[in-house]
Design a protein with these regions (language model features):
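A glycine- and Lys/Arg-enriched "phosphate-lid" helix/loop adjacent to the NTP-binding pocket
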Residues: 65-113
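Conserved nucleotide-binding/hydrolysis micro-motifs of P-loop NTPases
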Residues: 14, 49, 73-79, 128-130
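Small/polar loops that bind or transfer phosphate-bearing groups
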Residues: 44-45, 69-73, 124
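Anionic group-transfer/hydrolysis microenvironments
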Residues: 1, 47, 127
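Conserved nucleotide-sensing/catalytic segment adjacent to the nucleotide-binding pocket
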Residues: 16-65, 98
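Short, small-residue-biased leader/transition segments that mark boundaries at the very start
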Residues: 2-15
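Short, glycine/charged-enriched secondary-structure capping and boundary segments
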Residues: 57-60, 83-86, 136-138
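NTP-dependent small-molecule kinase module
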Residues: 114-160
Length: 160
């Protein structure tokens, strides 16, 4: 029989264990590093901020991993903040406004740095459900369907 080992941990899931998202984040990175070392397939949810996602993608690519990126986009900072407020109201974790603003303003630069390591990427608009609006293959970003949200047009300009 075939078996699959899956490493899974969110910094937010670690709160009951560690009582601290920072410690949970460190544990998540340790597990990601272990999966990479062991050649285990993995997935990571990330804001793409900081240098770690790019460094991880580069190392994974060098180790022979096939890299897929799934990006969910929103048009405005206020949409992002509103979603965080809704999550907090339902008992989820909060993110400081200044962190959201900083990450939001750099999001396309972060994607542009990561795309060279991706074998494929799919971009979804999340204005009203998930709608596939573009795909990245063979080094090219290709619109899909008729929907062209403002953020997608910004992304296209950012990666030219």
């Amino acid at each position: 029989t075939a078996t699959t080992e899956i490493y899974t941990l969110s910094p937010h899931d670690a709160l009951p264990i560690w009582g601290d998202e920072y410690e949970g984040g460190k544990l998540a990175v340790e597990r990601i590093e272990k999966a990479l070392e062991d050649g285990v397939n993995l997935t990571q949810e990330t804001t793409l901020s900081g240098g770690y996602p790019k460094r991880l993608a580069k190392r994974a690519k060098e180790a022979g991993y096939y890299i897929r990126l799934y990006y969910v986009g929103l048009n405005t900072l206020s949409e992002s903040l509103h979603r965080i407020q809704n999550r907090v109201a339902k008992g989820g974790h909060d993110i400081p406004h200044h962190d959201v603003e900083r990450r939001f303003s750099r999001r396309f630069d972060d994607i542009a740095k990561l795309l060279p390591y991706c074998d494929e990427a799919k971009f979804f608009d999340n204005d009203n459900g998930f709608v596939l609006v573009a795909e990245y293959r063979n080094g090219e970003l290709l619109p899909v369907g008729d929907k062209r949200p403002a953020w997608l047009l910004e992304l296209i300009n950012a990666i030219k």
